[in-house]
UniProtKB/Swiss-Prot annotation:
Function: May be an inorganic phosphate cotransporter.
Protein name: Putative inorganic phosphate cotransporter
Family in the record: Belongs to the major facilitator superfamily. Sodium/anion cotransporter family.
Keyword Coiled coil: no
Superkingdom in the source lineage: Eukaryota
Lineage, opening ranks: Eukaryota, Metazoa, Ecdysozoa, Arthropoda, Hexapoda
Gene that encodes it: Picot
CC terms in the record's Gene Ontology section: membrane
Record organism: Drosophila ananassae
InterPro entries, per database record: MFS (IPR011701), MFS_dom (IPR020846), MFS_Na/Anion_cotransporter (IPR050382), MFS_trans_sf (IPR036259), Pi_cotranspt (IPR004745)
Gene Ontology annotations of biological process type: monoatomic anion transport; phosphate ion transmembrane transport; sodium ion transport
């Protein structure tokens, strides 16, 4: 259910990136296409002007529309991280996604009746609703997943982000071209229905932690709790704010997260525009081909997570070394790919191949910094994620604004403007990944263990304890859902 929830969340984030290509009347604004034709010559597949939309929004306005979701998204990160620690995560996550899904139905009327700023307001509210998804998911993972399974299970859940993108982009392209009510509005109606159904199912069938699940086997419950918390009763101490603020491993995660989000949001929000404006793919092809990098990321994230867990369980690498090696793949890979793609010019196949490989390697972050919060502090993982995710999305919301302003000048060559966009994203990826390699850690921090009985890292105790075999022959843990 958490995998599907992450998928729904990213559907809501990414569908506007494809929809806006169909919404905007490209012949009514200057996009610099004439200069692009001079650079690359005539393309074999020209843009079909009949696909132009109803709104004369330039690149800068499109950047504000694409970023408006993230303004709402970042506001709710830290508050929900604190609330989830105190009251539990399940209700905040479920009702937040329900708000996000219901407001998706209002996107078409907001755009047509309220213009740019009406649309921005609705997308802002959607962002508010989606705010709990990551900190609350992290908090629930901390309660359900033993330390020696975090790479694999964490990657499996967060790979829902790529799965949602894979579904959203091609389906949004098809709905924009063949859907009802002018095409693009059907994107928000269809995904609004899907998100609403998931939210209701999540609130009915999912439980906060093993202790509240009515059907979980007692041995399984004991195994999960002891592998996470030792033999002590699970406690809820106050958040150690001062220790967190002084923690270099925390800042390593913070900067890695910020660098990732800036680069990732640059690609996620701007790739469909790049595919249309520079690579000149049709609307239908745009959505399908824009999803290929995220298909690669989904598949590679799962493969890399298995390698990461093997590195840890085989004891060939320390937890710290594993996180840094895998995270380097996840951040240096896309950074170098963006640099390479900026020099491929008009070669559509080569550009798409490089971006697909680069974004695919980005899947390493799910077994790198993205799951590292749980290593440092199982007790406060959700709160830490709320801080880093809030900061990361503040960085991420700058990406479409920066890109929109950089590519909005029709007097400059389009390829040159996009090269700057790619260079900036690559630089941020590499610098932040390097900071993580210098200061990151996989060790459980002292401020997560308030009692002397729990000074021993949970990873050590869990790695020497075999999971109980259940009556059906499977090993713990099972799914969070009761279904």
């Amino acid at each position: 259910m958490l995998f599907l929830g992450m998928a729904n969340a990213y559907v809501m984030r990414t569908n506007m990136s494809v929809a806006i290509v169909a919404m905007v009347n490209h012949t009514a604004i200057k996009s610099g296409e004439e200069e692009y034709d001079d650079e690359c010559g005539d393309r074999d597949i020209p843009i079909d002007d009949s696909q132009d939309g109803e709104f004369p929004w330039n690149a800068a306005l499109q950047g504000y529309i694409l970023s408006s979701f993230f303004y709402g998204y970042v506001i709710t990160q830290i508050p929900f991280g604190i609330l989830a620690k105190k009251y539990g995560s399940l209700r905040f996550l479920g009702y937040g996604m329900l708000i996000n899904s219901v407001f998706a139905f209002l996107v078409p009327v907001a755009a047509r009746e309220g213009g740019v700023w009406g649309l921005c307001a609705v997308r802002f509210i959607q962002g508010l609703g989606e705010g709990p998804i990551v900190p609350c998911t992290h908090a629930m993972l901390a309660k359900w997943i033993p330390p020696n399974e975090r790479s694999r299970m964490g990657a499996a859940v967060y790979a829902g982000a790529q799965f949602g993108t894979i579904i959203s982009m091609p389906l949004s392209g098809l709905l924009a071209e063949y859907g009802f009510d002018g095409g693009w509005p059907s994107i928000f109606y269809v995904f609004g229905i899907v998100g609403t159904v998931w939210s209701i199912a999540f609130l009915i069938f999912v439980y906060e932690d093993p202790s509240t699940h009515p059907k979980i086997d007692e041995r399984e419950k004991k195994y999960i709790n002891e592998s996470l918390w030792g033999t002590d009763v699970i406690k809820s101490p106050p958040i150690p704010f001062k220790s967190i603020v002084k923690s270099l491993p925390f800042y390593a995660i913070l900067f890695a997260h910020m660098g990732h989000n800036y680069g990732y949001e640059t690609l996620m929000t701007e790739l469909p525009t790049y595919m249309k404006q520079v690579l000149r793919f049709s609307l239908k092809s745009n959505g399908l081909l824009s999803s290929l990098p995220y298909l690669a990321m989904w598949l590679l994230s799962m493969f890399i997570s298995v390698i990461a867990d093997w590195m840890i369980s085989s004891k060939r690498f320390s937890l710290t070394a594993t996180r840094k090696i895998i995270n380097s793949i996840g951040q240096y890979g896309p950074g170098l790919a963006l640099i390479a793609a900026s020099y491929t010019g008009c070669d559509r196949a080569l550009t798409l191949a490089i971006l697909t490989i680069g974004v695919g390697l980005n899947g390493g972050i799910y077994s790198g910094f993205k799951i590292n919060h749980l290593d440092l502090t199982p007790r406060f993982a959700g709160f830490l994620m709320s801080i880093t995710n809030c900061s990361a999305n503040l960085a991420g919301l700058l990406a479409p604004i920066a890109a929109g302003n950089l590519i909005s000048d029709p007097s400059k060559p389009v390829m040159g403007q996009w090269q700057i966009v790619f260079f900036i994203a690559a630089f941020v990826y590499i610098i932040c990944g390097t900071f993580y390699n210098i200061f990151g850690s996989g060790e459980r921090q002292f401020w997560d263990n308030p009692s002397e009985d729990e000074q021993k890292p949970a990873l050590e105790s869990s790695s020497t304890t075999n999971p109980p075999r259940l009556s059906n022959g499977s090993s713990a843990p099972r799914a969070i859902s009761s279904s």
